[in-house]
């Protein structure tokens, strides 16, 4: 992943100041921009020396051939050519070394932040752009992990014994509810023209490196080894889908490409603590339905609005109150030029919590993956790369948590209407007592603005 190196070259029509400003609003290393510029010059100078040495070497070889043809000794020229050949070997190694260093310096520099992103380094200041639904509020509403236990929908103790911390067995109605959400989510997107993809669960290291940030390898991704191969379990189906068209030219007439990915996801979730670790809200393994779109560069921003709208409609149909926020510049991951989060209302917590993340990564990923937009036309100076966007539709364990809290009653869980055909019932009764015998009081409702 990374920016176009041409953007760093002011003499070639680039705009280094734009990158510096973007790094500044990301609260990232601005000096890294100059480091890339300086290294780029070293690469060009080293390649220039290599080209000149290759040209001299070719001339000497030609002279050797002429000497031999004339029956004359070419020993002196051959010795000179051998010296040049050794220089060429060293210069090639030097070029490889500085190019590798340049790529390492280039990779941590984030995508250009879109002008509509709020400038701040505190996510408490994310810009609220929309709210929907009525938020239930009441003292004593149960949390999702308590409700999941009361419907006998999971077994965290045995999961921990078998697989470790934050692992679990879904069981009984928990399995069926999980599958109902998957089926409803897939149908929701196929009706909107998306092609379903069930992805591989692991990726080759070199391919993963083109679509994941370096820090993800340590903090998020599980490594799998076998047969002398390094692979990584996926953290989201966005990762394999982004590489689905790698090294391809996609004609404009075949764009946009809309996919809905279905996969199990695996995350270390290093550093997570507190209430995030309760129940199945933030776990090491879960299913997720993901939107992924590929567009012409000029059309990606319209597509971003379409994608977040798809997610909004999904949660509206489920009757989940939510808000959409425009994420502040300092909280953007490197690939995202802009990101929306859709946060669902969790009445047990009396707060909004993230359900959806929708990002426009522009051409930041497609460059490394070499996914180009149309064949290069005559007179066109540079290759044109597609823009790539991703958006959660449903991380099923989180959706289960949100449904349980919003649809809890004194006797059980009311099933949201869209899930009833897939689940075969409209109510899930409690079969276990509330933990600590906590009672569920009568509920009242309020609008998000009244919270």
Swiss-Prot record:
UniProt GO BP: cytoplasmic translation; seryl-tRNA aminoacylation
CDD domains in alphabetical order: SerRS_core (cd00770)
Domain of life: Eukaryota
GO cellular component: cytosol; phagocytic vesicle
UniProt entry keywords in alphabetical sequence: Aminoacyl-tRNA synthetase, ATP-binding, Cytoplasm, Ligase, Nucleotide-binding, Protein biosynthesis
Keyword ATP-binding assigned: yes
Swiss-Prot/TrEMBL catalytic activity: tRNA(Ser) + L-serine + ATP = L-seryl-tRNA(Ser) + AMP + diphosphate + H(+); tRNA(Sec) + L-serine + ATP = L-seryl-tRNA(Sec) + AMP + diphosphate + H(+)
InterPro entries xrefs: aa-tRNA-synt_IIb, aa-tRNA-synth_II, aa-tRNA-synth_II/BPL/LPL, Ser-tRNA-ligase_type_1, Ser-tRNA-synth_1_N, SerRS_1_N_sf, SerRS_core, tRNA-bd_arm
This protein's record includes keyword Zinc: no
Binding site for L-serine: 236-238, 290, 392
Purpose: Catalyzes the attachment of serine to tRNA(Ser). Is also able to aminoacylate tRNA(Sec) with serine, to form the misacylated tRNA L-seryl-tRNA(Sec), which will be further converted into selenocysteinyl-tRNA(Sec).
Family the UniProt entry places it in: Belongs to the class-II aminoacyl-tRNA synthetase family. Type-1 seryl-tRNA synthetase subfamily.
Protein name per Swiss-Prot or TrEMBL: Serine--tRNA ligase, cytoplasmic
The organism of origin for this protein: Dictyostelium discoideum (Social amoeba)
Gene: serS
